[in-house]
């Protein structure tokens, strides 16, 4: 599926959240379902094909800032203002575990290890913590404190943990070798996503830029910018799609930008809002920010989560 066949048609609008949606992810495998986390302290499970709300998960006392789903779709983890990492059972909507220890809000989470046996979290307290999802211990099995500011993004690939921080650095922890590598971006990091090959990663920073970074050398392979693309205030999560041939990111004005990875050229600018304009607040209004995007490789669909409380699912039109 070449980049010029990128899906640009809104095929579903998922509503129900009362406040900005901060996190969106497809279920594992076929990606039949979508999980969302929002300012209203709720996690919701939707079937985008029917636009039906299937389940609401209520345990957070503060905003939900990130989500991750296990490979078997039986569990998911959520984090936010509670300073706690929640591990959920999907069918029963009950929490299996609650990991406490962070000193401030938890911004980001991921599964890792064989059989998704560990959880990784990053916090405003500047630490990355690794938790044993299988044991009953409440204490983290590892804590990394190298960041000089809030940890905004974590992801796991094999035995490596990628951690992006407001201090302008991406740190890659090799858990097998016991070493850390540091790439200096300069501007505050809001999002980190490794490529499928693992030899590079996409990073978003608060200078209205995305960059594709070479994993071994730390060199910038490609920069993605546009005169109309603004991201200087709010945390925006970007992603790669179409077999890593496109970079996708929301902006602070209610639109989504799609770049060709090889050339760095802008392919599409799409409006998250139905009326196709900036809405009430203009740029830098929380209501207009498209804070997260997610790609579904099998279905050739993707989703955008907005400050307007809606999630838009995009596909190929008839």
PLM-predicted stretches and their roles:
Residues 14-21, 57-64, 99-106, 144-151, ...:
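WD40/WD-repeat beta-propeller blade N-cap
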Residues 291-318:
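Blade-level signature of beta-propeller repeat domains, shared across WD40, Kelch, NHL, RCC1
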Residues 24, 43-46, 85-89, 109, ...:
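WD40-repeat beta-propellers
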Residues 9-11, 52-55, 94-97, 138-142, ...:
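A structural motif specific to WD40 beta-propellers
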Residues 24-31, 67-73, 79, 110-117, ...:
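Loop/turn segments within WD40 beta-propeller blades
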Residues 1-25, 30-33, 37:
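Intrinsically disordered, low-complexity acidic/Ser/Thr/Pro-rich linker and tail segments
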């Amino acid at each position: 599926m070449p980049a010029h066949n990128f899906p640009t048609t809104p095929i579903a609008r998922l509503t129900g959240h009362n406040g900005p949606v901060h996190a969106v992810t497809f279920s594992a495998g076929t990606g039949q379902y979508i999980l969302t986390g929002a300012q209203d302290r709720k996690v919701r499970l939707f079937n985008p094909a029917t636009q039906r709300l299937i389940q609401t998960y209520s345990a957070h006392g503060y905003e939900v800032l990130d989500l991750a789903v296990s490979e078997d779709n039986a569990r998911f983890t959520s984090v936010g203002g509670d300073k706690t990492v929640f591990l959920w059972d999907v069918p029963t909507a009950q929490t299996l575990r609650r990991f406490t220890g962070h000193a401030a809000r938890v911004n980001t989470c991921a599964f890792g290890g064989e059989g998704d046996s560990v959880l990784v979290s990053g916090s405003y307290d500047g630490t990355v913590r690794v938790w044993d999802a299988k044991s009953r211990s409440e204490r983290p099995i590892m804590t990394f404190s190298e960041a000089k500011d809030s940890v905004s993004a974590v992801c796991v690939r094999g035995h490596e943990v990628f951690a992006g921080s407001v201090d302008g650095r991406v740190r890659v922890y090799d858990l097998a070798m016991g070493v850390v590598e540091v790439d200096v971006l300069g501007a505050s990091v809001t999002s980190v996503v490794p490529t499928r090959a693992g030899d590079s990663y996409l990073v978003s920073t608060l200078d209205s830029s995305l960059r594709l970074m070479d994993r071994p050398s730390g060199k910038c392979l490609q920069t993605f910018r546009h005169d109309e693309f603004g991201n200087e205030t709010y945390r925006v999560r970007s992603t790669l799609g179409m077999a890593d041939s496109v970079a996708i990111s929301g902006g602070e004005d209610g639109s989504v930008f799609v770049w060709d990875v090889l050339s760095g050229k802008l392919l599409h600018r799409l409006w998250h809002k139905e009326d196709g304009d900036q809405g009430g607040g203009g740029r830098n209004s929380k209501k207009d920010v498209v804070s997260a995007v997610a790609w579904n490789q099998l279905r050739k669909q993707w989703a955008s989560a907005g400050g307007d409380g809606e999630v838009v699912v995009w596909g190929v039109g008839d």
